[in-house]
């Protein structure tokens, strides 16, 4: 869990934004520097997303240091494509995030003008 933020769909992709009292469930991987460089390219770092070091609370364990990609500012809310939405749902299922904490709310906010 990452605390004090919530999910948003911006330009049709997920990011997190500050939101006091809210939390976002996350999946955690240990990656090598080479893997990180590959993910950087995939995520459009540093132009589309930037990286931030965060404390992540692990279920059944304590906090760990982690890194998250956050979308650069200025991008409007926008609905995700069907393909991207299905990919996100699959990720939630893969990590057994059953109640989809905040995901449906982010989807609904993306519909608003």
Predicted ranges, named:
Residues 1-113:
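Glycine-aromatic micro-motifs
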